[in-house]
Amino acid sequence: MLYSFAANYTIFLSLLGYSFLFKLLVANKKNEILITNLDIIYGIITVIIIALISNFFIPLSKISAIILLIGIVFFLLTIIKRIIKINFLGFAVILFFFCFIFYDNGNNVDSAVYHIQTIKWANLYKIVFGLSNLDRLYSLNSTWHIFLSVFKFKINSFDTIYVINILPLTILFYEIFFSKDNDKKISYLTLYLSGVYLIFFAFLHPFKNGVIFNQYGNPEVDTVSMIFFILSFYFFLKCIEENKEKYFNLLLISSIICITTKITYSGVIIFPIYIFIIEKKYFSKLKIFYFSIFFSFIWFVRNFILTSCFV
């Protein structure tokens, strides 16, 4: 359990560094850069795009330590510049709680059948042409598995790929407990009720932590895509309530991660389309659009190489 907590917290700090890097490159007003809890989403997609490109040429295991350390360096810069606004103790408490209750979770069937294998292929080998010909299950091209492949570290019998899924859940509950500008808003109420449902369902279910929480401790994608769907809907409501560019940015990136994590969540794309077109809320100089197009292109190319199909 302590390994799980330490690994997740270290990766969390590294992701904050990549969040700073992302905002430094993409933000329209660099003098207004401030890193908060939800900005970790930027860090996640930055690591994923680096991994997607790198895996065309090398196995991700070759750069795992480098990527982690670079993120830590940028995180230290945010501390030096005092541009980070996160309750680190609060995040640690929530993370420790989930690491504790998920410690005894076992592996599910899907993990052994194909999740671990798809992670292994990205971690140990550069991209393989026609990988799905070996097994149709290898056609799963989840960006979350790419993310896990980057941060795959093994210490004795402990392997980080089994526990990193706890991070998105921690981000969700941190926002519920520590967000101070959401009171009495529908967006916050939606987020709060989503958290209550997850906890209540876990208590009601007769077997261990319930069907949903029993998935944790596995390198699966169902719970991760679920969390990003909840966050995407939250950002969608925030866009309607406050009409701020930062929430549209988060909505767009969160939706992309959600879809590319599990394609069955593709309906989430309706949220950013609605805000951008139906609501007529246009935002100027959005470099994030160019990034999103580039990210999608790389993901489609990877799909085509693995399966001869773009999706």
Language model region names:
Residues 1-84:
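Membrane-embedded, hydrophobic transmembrane alpha-helices
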Residues 2, 6, 160-167, 201-224:
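Membrane-embedded glycan-lipid processing machinery
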Residues 51-55, 247-263, 267-274, 294, ...:
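Membrane-interface alpha helices of multi-pass inner-membrane proteins
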Residues 60-64, 83-90, 185-189, 246, ...:
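Membrane-interfacial entry segments at the cytosolic side of transmembrane helices
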Residues 72-83, 268-293:
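Perimembrane helix-loop-helix junctions
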Residues 99-194, 214-216:
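Active-site lumenal/periplasmic loops and adjacent helix-entry segments of GT-C-fold
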Residues 103-106, 147, 286-311:
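Membrane-lumen/periplasm interface segments of specific transmembrane helices
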Residues 224, 229-248:
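Membrane-interface transmembrane helices that cradle and orient dolichyl/undecaprenyl
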